[in-house]
Amino acid sequence: MAAKLIVFVCAIALVAQSVLGTGCGCCCRGCGCGCGGCGCGCCENFRVCSNSAAPTGLSICSENRYKGDVCVCGEVPFLGTADVCGNMCSSGCGCIDYGCGNGCVGITRSCGGCGCGCGGCGCGCGGCGCC
């Protein structure tokens, strides 16, 4: 009887985690990139400390690999959070101006003077103002 009760409680816990979509809070699902750096030795200029839950309603999965310099410009649809796993050895900085409530769901404006000290990345964006 006790074994059936234990199996029942474990099944309820599994269903609750599946329905609620929350993880265990172990930061990036065990990739080893703890708060303040990714552990690969080249992330001194890219300090991020966040432990947000992954999106549960809308999910976009991309398995692209980028090598070399990458500069992103323009308006990007963005709903809530992003879940990124793996080693990300990055340098540079960026700014996000998140707007909502006016019908625009996305990064609505890129800011040039964000105070992050990058001063220009030289990535050849053509003056888009993203760096």
Curated annotation (Swiss-Prot):
The keyword Manganese does not apply. Keywords: Repeat, Signal. GO terms for biological process: chorion-containing eggshell formation. Residues 1-21 form the signal peptide. One of its GO terms (molecular function) is structural constituent of egg chorion. Residues 22-46 are annotated as: Left arm. Residues 47-110 are annotated as: Central domain. Residues 111-131 are annotated as: Right arm (Gly-rich tandem repeats). One of its GO terms (cellular component) is egg chorion. Belongs to the chorion protein family. This is Chorion class high-cysteine HCB protein 12.
